[in-house]
Amino acid sequence: MTAQGQGRAARRLILWDVDGTLVSCGPAGREALESGARLVAGLAALPHLPMGGKTDPQIIGEMLLGAGVAPADLGSLVPVALAEAKRALAGWRERMGREGKVHPGVRRLLDELAARGGVRQPLLTGNVAVNAAIKVGAFGLEGYFDLPVGAYGDDNAQRELLVPIALDRMRELRGETYQPEQVWVIGDTARDLSCARAAGVRCLLVGTGRDGFDAVRGLEADALMENLADTGAALGILLGRSGRGAPAAGGARGRLRSPGG
């Protein structure tokens, strides 16, 4: 198993979360999942559940359970609901572009990382693959990501199992292998951190999610940033020696955890 056919691993694998990290899509993402759940549950109203960091199958399953669907029926109903959610979201691509936004610094950081040899940027997200592609495409970001080697909610409903899937795909489809210190998960929730920790890789958390920086401030991520607007700080964290870079000026804006925590 070799990287780029040269018998050595590429320098960095950056696994990007989508919602709250790269972009915010407005209400369309939630409404698409709700439309799928309503289709199979036959209800006009569904319980309003927190979604941050969860996979699409997990969210729909929780919606259906909250609507009174029997747990034994989830295996047959969740795929039907997901199919409807995909259909709905595909029709709202332009709407997401109008109502949503790309978070500060994201485009510039993607450009800078793409310009560096040996840096790969797949997605690692709770979205099913089709919906992830629709969401990044709504903002013209799809060209930055190696979508076939990403890991998605339809690969496994448990987010903690997604990093190994991405690593396996990089090896099988691109011939590239990575050591844990070469891999970063970038996300905006505690579930992104748990996902990284389960695989023994590094995690950069940003405060651009629905609940802001307070939601991640106290978490033991390898690095914390309010947002990605400081490109130099983000590059220092992601590409620095041993993967730890140098702490940015400005306190929590680019705070790096020490190896001891």
What annotation goes with each model-predicted range?
Residues 13, 64, 85-86, 209:
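Membrane-embedded alpha-helical bundles of multi-pass transporters/translocases
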Residues 185-223:
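Acidic, Mg2+-coordinating phosphoryl-transfer loop and its flanking beta/alpha structural elements
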Residues 30, 34, 56-57, 61, ...:
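An amphipathic alpha-helix signature
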Residues 2-52, 58-65:
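Active-site neighborhood of HAD-like aspartate-dependent phosphohydrolases
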Residues 151, 223-228:
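Short acidic-hydrophobic, aromatic-tinged amphipathic segments that line or gate anion-handling sites
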Residues 15, 91-123:
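Short, acidic loop-to-helix structural element flanking the phosphoryl-transfer center
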